[in-house]
Protein backbone atom coordinates (compact mmCIF):
# COMPACT_ATOMS: atom_id res chain seq x y z
CA UNK A 1 0.00 0.00 0.00
CA UNK A 2 2.79 2.39 0.97
CA UNK A 3 4.54 1.61 -2.29
CA UNK A 4 1.45 2.55 -4.32
CA UNK A 5 1.01 5.84 -2.42
CA UNK A 6 4.67 6.70 -3.02
CA UNK A 7 4.24 5.92 -6.72
CA UNK A 8 1.13 8.14 -7.05
CA UNK A 9 2.79 10.95 -5.05
CA UNK A 10 5.92 10.93 -7.20
CA UNK A 11 3.76 10.87 -10.32
CA UNK A 12 1.78 13.89 -9.06
CA UNK A 13 4.94 15.81 -8.18
CA UNK A 14 6.51 15.02 -11.55
CA UNK A 15 3.52 16.24 -13.57
CA UNK A 16 2.99 19.42 -11.55
CA UNK A 17 6.69 20.29 -11.54
CA UNK A 18 6.76 19.63 -15.27
CA UNK A 19 3.89 22.06 -15.75
CA UNK A 20 5.80 24.68 -13.80
CA UNK A 21 8.87 24.24 -16.00
CA UNK A 22 6.75 24.43 -19.14
CA UNK A 23 5.15 27.62 -17.85
CA UNK A 24 8.51 29.36 -17.92
CA UNK A 25 8.77 28.63 -21.65
CA UNK A 26 5.13 28.78 -22.71
CA UNK A 27 3.69 31.41 -20.36
CA UNK A 28 -0.01 31.65 -19.74
CA UNK A 29 -0.90 28.64 -21.88
CA UNK A 30 1.06 26.22 -19.73
CA UNK A 31 -0.25 27.78 -16.50
CA UNK A 32 -3.81 27.33 -17.74
CA UNK A 33 -3.14 23.61 -18.08
CA UNK A 34 -2.11 23.11 -14.43
CA UNK A 35 -5.68 22.23 -13.27
CA UNK A 36 -5.82 19.58 -15.98
CA UNK A 37 -2.45 18.17 -14.96
CA UNK A 38 -3.53 18.05 -11.30
CA UNK A 39 -6.53 15.98 -12.33
CA UNK A 40 -4.30 13.69 -14.34
CA UNK A 41 -1.88 13.35 -11.43
CA UNK A 42 -4.59 12.39 -8.94
CA UNK A 43 -6.27 9.91 -11.28
CA UNK A 44 -5.84 6.18 -10.92
CA UNK A 45 -3.00 4.64 -12.89
CA UNK A 46 -5.32 2.90 -15.35
CA UNK A 47 -8.23 5.34 -15.46
CA UNK A 48 -8.24 9.02 -16.41
CA UNK A 49 -11.55 10.82 -15.91
CA UNK A 50 -13.01 14.33 -15.79
CA UNK A 51 -10.74 15.83 -18.45
CA UNK A 52 -11.42 19.37 -19.56
CA UNK A 53 -13.59 19.31 -22.73
CA UNK A 54 -12.30 20.34 -26.14
CA UNK A 55 -13.91 23.46 -27.61
CA UNK A 56 -16.92 22.65 -29.76
CA UNK A 57 -15.42 24.29 -32.85
CA UNK A 58 -12.03 25.46 -33.94
CA UNK A 59 -11.60 28.43 -36.23
CA UNK A 60 -11.16 26.41 -39.42
CA UNK A 61 -14.38 24.49 -38.71
CA UNK A 62 -16.25 27.76 -38.31
CA UNK A 63 -15.02 28.86 -41.76
CA UNK A 64 -16.24 25.61 -43.34
CA UNK A 65 -19.64 25.91 -41.67
CA UNK A 66 -19.97 29.53 -42.72
CA UNK A 67 -19.24 28.64 -46.36
CA UNK A 68 -21.67 25.73 -46.13
CA UNK A 69 -24.38 28.13 -45.00
CA UNK A 70 -23.42 30.58 -47.75
CA UNK A 71 -23.87 27.88 -50.41
CA UNK A 72 -27.22 26.75 -49.06
CA UNK A 73 -28.45 30.32 -48.85
CA UNK A 74 -27.40 30.90 -52.46
CA UNK A 75 -29.35 27.86 -53.65
CA UNK A 76 -32.57 29.45 -52.45
CA UNK A 77 -32.22 31.91 -55.35
CA UNK A 78 -32.72 31.23 -59.07
CA UNK A 79 -29.50 29.94 -60.65
CA UNK A 80 -29.12 33.00 -62.86
CA UNK A 81 -28.84 35.17 -59.74
CA UNK A 82 -25.87 33.18 -58.39
CA UNK A 83 -22.25 33.90 -59.29
CA UNK A 84 -19.98 31.19 -57.93
CA UNK A 85 -16.44 32.38 -57.31
CA UNK A 86 -13.38 30.89 -55.67
CA UNK A 87 -10.86 32.72 -53.48
CA UNK A 88 -7.39 31.29 -52.80
CA UNK A 89 -5.13 32.74 -50.10
CA UNK A 90 -1.57 32.23 -51.36
CA UNK A 91 -0.13 32.99 -47.91
CA UNK A 92 -1.97 29.99 -46.49
CA UNK A 93 -1.21 27.51 -49.27
CA UNK A 94 1.53 25.11 -48.12
CA UNK A 95 1.89 23.24 -51.40
CA UNK A 96 0.63 19.93 -49.99
CA UNK A 97 -1.44 19.18 -53.13
CA UNK A 98 -4.25 17.69 -51.04
CA UNK A 99 -6.67 19.66 -53.23
CA UNK A 100 -5.22 18.06 -56.37
CA UNK A 101 -5.48 14.55 -54.95
CA UNK A 102 -9.01 15.11 -53.62
CA UNK A 103 -10.11 16.39 -57.01
CA UNK A 104 -8.69 13.32 -58.75
CA UNK A 105 -10.57 11.10 -56.31
CA UNK A 106 -13.86 13.00 -56.50
CA UNK A 107 -13.95 13.09 -60.29
CA UNK A 108 -12.23 9.71 -60.89
CA UNK A 109 -9.63 11.40 -63.10
CA UNK A 110 -7.33 9.33 -65.33
CA UNK A 111 -3.61 9.86 -66.01
CA UNK A 112 -2.83 13.24 -67.54
CA UNK A 113 -6.16 14.80 -66.54
CA UNK A 114 -5.65 17.25 -63.69
CA UNK A 115 -8.27 19.88 -62.86
CA UNK A 116 -6.40 21.62 -60.07
CA UNK A 117 -2.62 21.51 -60.27
CA UNK A 118 -0.53 23.43 -57.76
CA UNK A 119 2.13 25.42 -59.59
CA UNK A 120 5.41 25.61 -57.69
CA UNK A 121 7.83 28.50 -58.20
CA UNK A 122 11.23 29.16 -56.67
CA UNK A 123 11.73 32.81 -55.81
CA UNK A 124 14.89 34.66 -54.84
CA UNK A 125 18.62 34.12 -55.15
CA UNK A 126 20.58 31.55 -53.16
CA UNK A 127 20.79 31.45 -50.19
CA UNK A 128 17.69 33.67 -49.83
CA UNK A 129 15.33 31.37 -51.67
CA UNK A 130 11.70 30.58 -50.97
CA UNK A 131 8.92 28.71 -52.72
CA UNK A 132 5.58 30.03 -53.89
CA UNK A 133 2.60 27.74 -54.46
CA UNK A 134 -0.28 28.70 -56.74
CA UNK A 135 -3.28 26.37 -57.05
CA UNK A 136 -4.74 26.81 -60.53
CA UNK A 137 -8.31 25.61 -61.09
CA UNK A 138 -10.39 26.69 -64.09
CA UNK A 139 -10.93 30.43 -63.84
CA UNK A 140 -14.62 30.19 -64.87
CA UNK A 141 -14.04 33.37 -66.87
CA UNK A 142 -16.78 35.92 -67.34
CA UNK A 143 -15.63 36.20 -70.97
CA UNK A 144 -14.17 32.74 -71.64
CA UNK A 145 -12.09 32.37 -74.84
CA UNK A 146 -12.79 28.62 -74.86
CA UNK A 147 -16.51 28.96 -75.55
CA UNK A 148 -15.94 31.16 -78.58
CA UNK A 149 -13.83 28.61 -80.46
CA UNK A 150 -15.95 25.49 -79.86
CA UNK A 151 -17.48 24.71 -83.29
CA UNK A 152 -20.59 23.03 -81.89
CA UNK A 153 -21.21 24.86 -78.62
CA UNK A 154 -20.22 21.90 -76.43
CA UNK A 155 -18.51 24.21 -73.96
CA UNK A 156 -20.63 27.02 -72.64
CA UNK A 157 -21.20 29.34 -69.71
CA UNK A 158 -23.99 28.06 -67.46
CA UNK A 159 -26.50 30.20 -65.60
CA UNK A 160 -24.55 30.17 -62.34
CA UNK A 161 -21.35 31.42 -63.99
CA UNK A 162 -19.54 28.08 -64.25
CA UNK A 163 -18.06 27.22 -67.63
CA UNK A 164 -19.26 23.71 -68.43
CA UNK A 165 -18.66 21.01 -71.04
CA UNK A 166 -21.41 18.88 -72.56
CA UNK A 167 -19.59 15.56 -72.90
CA UNK A 168 -22.30 14.18 -75.18
CA UNK A 169 -21.76 16.99 -77.68
CA UNK A 170 -17.96 17.37 -77.44
CA UNK A 171 -16.21 16.01 -80.56
CA UNK A 172 -12.70 16.19 -79.11
CA UNK A 173 -11.34 18.81 -81.50
CA UNK A 174 -9.33 20.38 -78.65
CA UNK A 175 -9.73 23.95 -79.94
CA UNK A 176 -10.82 25.00 -76.46
CA UNK A 177 -7.63 23.57 -74.94
CA UNK A 178 -5.54 25.73 -77.25
CA UNK A 179 -7.66 28.82 -76.63
CA UNK A 180 -7.47 28.74 -72.81
CA UNK A 181 -4.80 31.25 -71.68
CA UNK A 182 -4.56 29.56 -68.26
CA UNK A 183 -3.84 26.02 -69.44
CA UNK A 184 -6.85 24.89 -67.43
CA UNK A 185 -8.11 22.28 -69.90
CA UNK A 186 -6.85 18.78 -70.54
CA UNK A 187 -7.87 15.90 -72.81
CA UNK A 188 -9.04 12.44 -71.81
CA UNK A 189 -7.11 9.98 -73.98
CA UNK A 190 -8.74 6.93 -72.41
CA UNK A 191 -5.80 5.83 -70.29
CA UNK A 192 -5.97 4.18 -66.87
CA UNK A 193 -3.57 4.32 -63.93
CA UNK A 194 -3.56 0.52 -63.70
CA UNK A 195 -3.61 -0.09 -67.44
CA UNK A 196 -0.44 -2.22 -67.59
CA UNK A 197 -1.42 -4.48 -64.72
CA UNK A 198 -3.34 -7.79 -64.94
CA UNK A 199 -6.63 -5.90 -64.72
CA UNK A 200 -8.01 -2.39 -64.31
CA UNK A 201 -8.54 -1.79 -60.61
CA UNK A 202 -12.07 -1.32 -59.32
CA UNK A 203 -11.52 2.26 -58.12
CA UNK A 204 -10.98 3.33 -61.75
CA UNK A 205 -14.31 1.81 -62.71
CA UNK A 206 -16.26 3.82 -60.16
CA UNK A 207 -18.72 6.35 -61.59
CA UNK A 208 -18.20 10.09 -61.38
CA UNK A 209 -21.00 12.62 -61.14
CA UNK A 210 -19.68 15.61 -63.05
CA UNK A 211 -22.41 18.05 -64.08
CA UNK A 212 -24.93 15.93 -62.17
CA UNK A 213 -24.71 12.94 -64.55
CA UNK A 214 -23.53 9.51 -63.44
CA UNK A 215 -20.85 8.23 -65.80
CA UNK A 216 -18.42 5.32 -65.78
CA UNK A 217 -15.32 5.77 -67.94
CA UNK A 218 -15.40 3.13 -70.67
CA UNK A 219 -13.63 2.94 -74.00
CA UNK A 220 -15.46 4.76 -76.81
CA UNK A 221 -17.79 6.48 -74.33
CA UNK A 222 -17.66 10.02 -72.90
CA UNK A 223 -15.77 11.52 -71.17
CA UNK A 224 -13.07 9.53 -72.99
CA UNK A 225 -12.20 11.51 -76.11
CA UNK A 226 -13.44 14.77 -74.59
CA UNK A 227 -11.86 17.96 -73.28
CA UNK A 228 -12.11 18.08 -69.49
CA UNK A 229 -11.74 20.79 -66.86
CA UNK A 230 -12.49 21.96 -63.34
CA UNK A 231 -16.12 22.91 -62.73
CA UNK A 232 -15.91 23.93 -59.05
CA UNK A 233 -17.57 20.56 -58.27
CA UNK A 234 -20.81 21.91 -59.68
CA UNK A 235 -22.52 18.60 -58.88
CA UNK A 236 -21.69 19.10 -55.20
CA UNK A 237 -22.59 22.80 -55.06
CA UNK A 238 -26.05 22.11 -56.47
CA UNK A 239 -26.59 19.60 -53.65
CA UNK A 240 -25.59 22.14 -51.01
CA UNK A 241 -22.06 20.76 -50.51
CA UNK A 242 -18.72 22.52 -50.83
CA UNK A 243 -16.24 21.82 -53.61
CA UNK A 244 -13.96 18.92 -52.69
CA UNK A 245 -10.80 21.05 -52.89
CA UNK A 246 -12.29 23.47 -50.36
CA UNK A 247 -13.10 20.84 -47.73
CA UNK A 248 -9.73 19.06 -48.02
CA UNK A 249 -7.44 22.11 -47.99
CA UNK A 250 -5.09 21.60 -45.03
CA UNK A 251 -4.20 25.28 -44.75
CA UNK A 252 -7.81 26.47 -45.21
CA UNK A 253 -6.52 28.50 -48.15
CA UNK A 254 -9.47 27.91 -50.51
CA UNK A 255 -12.92 29.45 -50.25
CA UNK A 256 -16.03 29.26 -52.41
CA UNK A 257 -19.36 31.04 -52.43
CA UNK A 258 -21.74 33.40 -54.16
CA UNK A 259 -20.20 36.69 -55.21
CA UNK A 260 -23.67 38.22 -55.47
CA UNK A 261 -24.36 37.62 -51.77
CA UNK A 262 -22.92 40.56 -49.78
CA UNK A 263 -23.06 38.45 -46.59
CA UNK A 264 -20.96 35.62 -48.02
CA UNK A 265 -17.39 35.00 -46.91
CA UNK A 266 -16.08 35.27 -50.47
CA UNK A 267 -17.69 38.68 -50.95
CA UNK A 268 -15.91 39.80 -47.79
CA UNK A 269 -12.56 38.38 -48.92
CA UNK A 270 -12.51 39.96 -52.39
CA UNK A 271 -12.92 43.38 -50.78
CA UNK A 272 -9.39 42.98 -49.42
CA UNK A 273 -6.60 45.17 -50.83
CA UNK A 274 -4.57 41.95 -51.18
CA UNK A 275 -6.81 40.60 -53.94
CA UNK A 276 -5.65 39.96 -57.52
CA UNK A 277 -6.59 37.82 -60.52
CA UNK A 278 -4.42 36.10 -63.10
CA UNK A 279 -3.92 37.72 -66.52
CA UNK A 280 -6.54 40.40 -65.97
CA UNK A 281 -5.07 42.31 -68.90
CA UNK A 282 -6.64 39.76 -71.28
CA UNK A 283 -10.14 40.92 -70.38
CA UNK A 284 -11.33 37.42 -69.49
CA UNK A 285 -12.64 38.55 -66.07
CA UNK A 286 -11.68 35.36 -64.19
CA UNK A 287 -13.86 34.28 -61.27
CA UNK A 288 -10.94 32.91 -59.25
CA UNK A 289 -9.44 35.53 -56.94
CA UNK A 290 -6.09 35.28 -55.19
CA UNK A 291 -5.05 36.91 -51.92
CA UNK A 292 -1.35 37.76 -52.07
UniProtKB/Swiss-Prot annotation:
Binding site for [4Fe-4S] cluster 1: 93, 96, 99, 249
SUPFAM superfamilies cross-referenced by the UniProt entry: 4Fe-4S ferredoxins
Binding annotation for [4Fe-4S] cluster 2: 103, 230, 233, 245
Gene3D superfamilies: 3.30.70.20
Cofactor(s) demanded: [4Fe-4S] cluster
Annotated residues for binding of [4Fe-4S] cluster 4: 150, 170, 173, 176
Signal peptide positions (record): 1-43
Cofactor: record remark: Binds 4 [4Fe-4S] cluster.
Main function: Component of the respiratory selenate reductase complex, which catalyzes the reduction of selenate to selenite. This subunit probably transfers electrons from SrdC to SrdA.
Subunit architecture: The complex is composed of three subunits: SrdA, SrdB and SrdC.
Protein name per the record: Selenate reductase subunit B
Organism classification: Bacteria, Bacillati, Bacillota, Bacilli, Bacillales
Encoding gene (name): srdB
Amino acid sequence: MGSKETKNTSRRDFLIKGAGAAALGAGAFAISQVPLLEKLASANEDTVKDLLPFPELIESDEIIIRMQNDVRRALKKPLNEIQWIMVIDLKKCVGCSSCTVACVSENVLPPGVVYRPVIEEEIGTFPNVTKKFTPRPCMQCEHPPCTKVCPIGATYKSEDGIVAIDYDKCIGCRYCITACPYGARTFDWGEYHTENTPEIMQYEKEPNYEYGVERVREKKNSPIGNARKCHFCKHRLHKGMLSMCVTTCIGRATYIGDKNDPESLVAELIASPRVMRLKEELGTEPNVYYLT
